[in-house]
């Protein structure tokens, strides 16, 4: 096995490579920025690779939403061209039937997790010339997030992580792909880079 320093360097290098591969596009590229670590990493690395400000997008139900605050801090730091989309309860309720039909489920957690992405992508499709979106999807499943907070051992953590990666296509990837593609946008997921996933 590699030592910790080597592992960290390899994860860094493979993520940077995965992002660089996904920046090649004939169409305009945008970035979903939630303010969380995963999307912030993707945006920061992409901003470093770009010779002009990248275009980032965040969504929230009020201007003082905590996610919008963190996304704005990241956007300011990386000097992106940042757009905040504020949605209302009526926006959510009027889109509920469409999102349920799109996802093919009544699962509350899945619908809740999808609504913001669906409405943000709808905004991007209707109001911008962006055709390709980079996201921070899949990092939670690869690195544990809340799923493994209480794993009794390193072996159990690894077992749960491997299970989540094997079943990835049934959950978040499908949800994100549907919310993005229904709005005529192409999703690109650097954390899903095969070389990166296999190493992690």
In which residue ranges do the predicted regions lie?
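ATP-dependent adenylate-handling active sites, centered on carboxylate activation for C-N bond formation
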Residues: 1-200
């Amino acid at each position: 096995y590699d030592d910790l320093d080597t592992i960290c360097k390899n994860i860094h290098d493979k993520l940077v490579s995965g992002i660089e591969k996904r920046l090649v596009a004939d169409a305009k590229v945008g970035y979903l920025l939630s303010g969380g670590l995963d999307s912030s990493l993707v945006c920061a690395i992409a901003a470093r690779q770009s010779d002009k400000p990248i275009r980032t997008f965040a969504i929230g139900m009020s201007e003082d939403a905590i996610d919008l605050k963190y996304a704005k801090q990241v956007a300011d730091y990386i000097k992106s061209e940042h757009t905040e989309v504020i949605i209302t309860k009526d926006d959510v309720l009027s889109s509920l039937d469409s999102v349920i039909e799109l996802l093919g489920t009544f699962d509350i957690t899945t619908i809740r997790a999808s609504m913001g992405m669906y409405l943000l992508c709808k905004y991007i499709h209707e109001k911008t010339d962006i055709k390709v979106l980079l996201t921070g999807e899949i990092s939670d499943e690869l690195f544990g997030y809340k799923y493994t907070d209480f794993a009794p051992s390193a072996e159990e953590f690894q077992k749960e992580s491997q299970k989540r990666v094997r079943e990835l296509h049934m959950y978040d990837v499908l949800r994100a792909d549907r919310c993005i593609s229904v709005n005529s946008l192409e999703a690109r997921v650097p954390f899903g880079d095969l070389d990166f996933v296999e190493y992690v």
